[in-house]
């Protein structure tokens, strides 16, 4: 999974 995807998920 892309790192940026996780940031947009958890760091909303």
UniProtKB/Swiss-Prot annotation:
It comes from the Bacteria. GO terms for molecular function: heparin binding; heparin lyase activity. The N-terminus is blocked. It is an enzyme of class 4 (lyase). Keywords: Heparin-binding, Lyase. It catalyses: Eliminative cleavage of polysaccharides containing (1->4)-linked D-glucuronate or L-iduronate residues and (1->4)-alpha-linked 2-sulfoamino-2-deoxy-6-sulfo-D-glucose residues to give oligosaccharides with terminal 4-deoxy-alpha-D-gluc-4-enuronosyl groups at their non-reducing ends. Inhibited by Cu(2+) ion, lead and some agents that modify histidine and cysteine residues. Activated by KCl and by reducing agents, such as dithiothreitol and 2-mercaptoethanol. Its EC number is 4.2.2.7. Optimum temperature is 45 degrees Celsius. Optimum pH is 7.2. Degrades heparin and heparan sulfate. This is Heparin lyase. It comes from Bacteroides stercoris.
């Amino acid at each position: 999974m892309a790192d940026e995807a996780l940031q947009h998920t958890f760091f909303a």
